[in-house]
Every structure is written in C-alpha cells, then in structure tokens.
C-alpha cells in the first residue's frame, strides 16, 4: 500500500481519503465529486502552507490531517504554527474546510456535527 491513493467509505457514508501517492492532481480529479469528509495527506517539508491549503480545496475535503509527523519533529518544526497558517488561508478564502494537526500517539474521535452555541 506504499505510495497509493484511495478512498474508504464507511457504512454511514463517511468518506476518508488517504493521499500518499505522488499523482495527487490526478487523484483529486477522481475523488473530487465524492467530497471526502476527512483527508489524510503527507505534508512534504517543501510545501508552503498555501500549497497544503490548495490541496485541501482541490480535494473538496472537510477536514485534513497530516501524515508523517516524524519529519517535522526531526527538524524541530512547529506543525501547530504551520497548520494554524493553513487554516487562516482557508478562512480568508471563505472555505469551511479546516486542517487539524493531531498530537502524535493520541487517540481522537472524529465526527461531523452541528451543535447549538
């Protein structure tokens, strides 16, 4: 499964995109109409926050989470600051999509909800 892109759809119609391959643009063309709820995508160090924001928008995903935290930790890069900038860019563009940088080795529950304020 190395270097492969695919989408998993749960029984509840929740779509998870796993984008690890190099043909990202072609992959986007195939899954854009599916509008994944969650995009898991490796974040290459040379990607500017604008590039990652573009990828989220190209995919049409609601939430994006990075893969491969080890590269950032090895270089002491602050991925929280990086993804804060990605979210600022998405917000400026009027996108409702957001990137989330999970804490390594911590479990999360991911859901899409509407809650009253």
Where are the regions a protein language model picked out?
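A short acidic, amphipathic alpha-helical/loop segment
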Residues: 28-31, 50-58
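Structural recognition of the beta-strand scaffold that forms the well-ordered cores
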Residues: 16-19, 37-42, 64-67
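A signal for specific C-terminal beta-sheet/loop modules enriched in small/flexible residues
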Residues: 28-44, 76, 80, 84-85
């Amino acid at each position: 499964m190395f270097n492969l892109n695919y989408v998993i759809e749960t029984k509840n119609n929740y779509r998870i995109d796993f984008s690890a391959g190099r043909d990202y643009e072609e992959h986007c063309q195939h899954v854009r109409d599916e509008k994944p709820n969650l995009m898991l995508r490796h974040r290459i160090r040379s990607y500017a926050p604008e590039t990652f924001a573009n990828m989220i928008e190209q995919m049409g995903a609601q939430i994006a989470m990075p893969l491969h935290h080890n590269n950032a930790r090895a270089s002491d890069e602050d991925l929280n600051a990086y993804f804060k900038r990605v979210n600022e860019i998405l917000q400026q563009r009027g996108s409702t999509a957001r990137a989330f940088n999970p804490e390594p080795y911590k479990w999360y529950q991911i859901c899409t909800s509407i809650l009253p304020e």
